A protein has these predicted regions:
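C-terminal peripheral helix-coil segments that are non-catalytic and often amphipathic
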Residues: 128, 132, 147, 158-184
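N-terminal intrinsically disordered/low-complexity leader segments
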Residues: 1-7, 184
Length: 184
């Protein structure tokens, strides 16, 4: 008879995400995840297969949390609703090194077809959510959503270089400026 699980798969996958963004792809190990969540590495292999399987499951779970957060966000049309949605999705990163580690994972999203599919799923969810909240603009909503997503992502990079204020405040200011231009 199998022993009962002390730590749920959901908790293990949440711990794996923490390790992923603390360590980066090169230093992400099953041993580091096992230490984070308090189980033995062979247990991780038994439950998730290998390191790649664990990463894919962790990111799939994170996409589910992302979808839930987007679904719970106010759906009113307008600037405030769109900026509020992005505020909900912008992490309060204090350390540019954490942001840089995220960029290393972005590289993996470009290279690995399964990771790329998960990333595209997330971007599609975001694009749809933004498009349905946008106020009337002089371009189609799908194009406007794509452009404001690029502004949002670019603001992360600019903050990493210039470190003006907090990341959430910097992003919000960047999105406000985008709307000022788009609505002019």
């Amino acid at each position: 008879m199998a022993r009962p699980r002390r730590i749920s798969d959901e908790a293990v996958l949440a711990g794996a995400l923490k390790v992923m963004f603390r360590k980066g792809p090169a230093d992400f190990t099953l041993a580091a995840v096992a230490a984070e969540v308090g189980i033995a590495p062979p247990t991780l292999v038994q439950r998730f297969g290998d390191k790649r399987g664990l990463i894919l499951r962790a990111l799939a779970q994170d996409n589910g949390a992302f979808a839930a957060a987007v679904a719970e966000a106010p759906k009113a049309r307008g600037r405030a609703s769109v900026i509020g949605l992005f505020a909900l999705l912008t992490p309060d990163i204090q350390d540019p090194d954490v942001l840089a580690t995220g960029l290393l994972w972005l590289r993996e999203d470009f290279r690995d077809p399964a990771l790329n599919a998960l990333a595209r799923e997330r971007w599609s969810m975001l694009r749809e959510a933004v498009a349905e909240r946008l106020p009337p603009l002089p371009v189609p909503p799908e194009l406007a959503a794509r452009l404001i997503e690029a502004q949002w992502q670019g603001a992360f990079n600019q903050w990493g270089f210039f470190r003006e204020g907090t990341l959430p405040d910097f992003v919000a200011g960047s999105l406000e400026a985008w709307f000022d231009l788009a609505e002019a």
